[in-house]
Amino acid sequence: HLGVPKAVAIARAIAEVDPYFEVELFTEGFTDENAETFMDGLDFVCDACDQVRAKANLRWYAKVNGIPLIMETSDRGMIDIERYDEANTPFLHGRISDDMMEEMRISSAWKPEYFDAFIDVSQASQRGVSSLQAIGTTLVGWPQLYTDVAAGGSHAAQVIRSVFLGEHVPDARHYLEVNEQLLESVN
């Protein structure tokens, strides 16, 4: 999928699962201009955005529209469940203040404090921290292994299903790190 826009790659994958699904592409990404159209009719938002502005605006509009949001980060299997369908839910479990949210919504670049709000650098793996430090020099973006991405997608789907079934799924951050659990079971 190198060189193929993320929206196109995902649309192709959806068509392979069920060619009768109706898919609407937003090739320009998620923007203020298309936010209301994008959110219209959604039951859940899955954040797979790379740009800080898009990540912030997804949360802003999810909260305005009362739509739960999920973000899976392949580092340590981190998964954020953000219950904007529940009253008074703060942005990213209170990790993003209203002032920081306003900054992020118009920002064109990542700042260290934005990275920390989204991934909590103190909890990131050593490999993840090294990758963050290399972005913009030897790396163009956050590296992700397919196995981690596939596992994360599965975890996100399980959470979404549980929410849709009416099970109690609180606003929270979880780490579902398989490698850590495997090492702990051996030791």
Predicted segments, located by residue:
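Glycine-rich phosphate-binding loop and adjoining beta1-alpha1-beta2 segment
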Residues: 1-18
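Residue-level recognition of alpha-helix initiation/capping sites
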Residues: 5, 30, 52-53, 155
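Short glycine/serine/threonine/alanine-rich loop segments
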Residues: 19-23, 66-67
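Conserved SAM/SAH-binding loop
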Residues: 26-35
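A short, aliphatic-rich alpha-helical micro-motif
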Residues: 38-43
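E1/E1-like adenylate-forming module used to activate ubiquitin-like modifiers
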Residues: 44-147, 179-187
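Mid-domain beta-loop-alpha active-site segment that forms a flexible
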Residues: 141-164
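Phosphate-binding loop/pocket of nucleotide- and phosphate-handling active sites
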Residues: 159-187
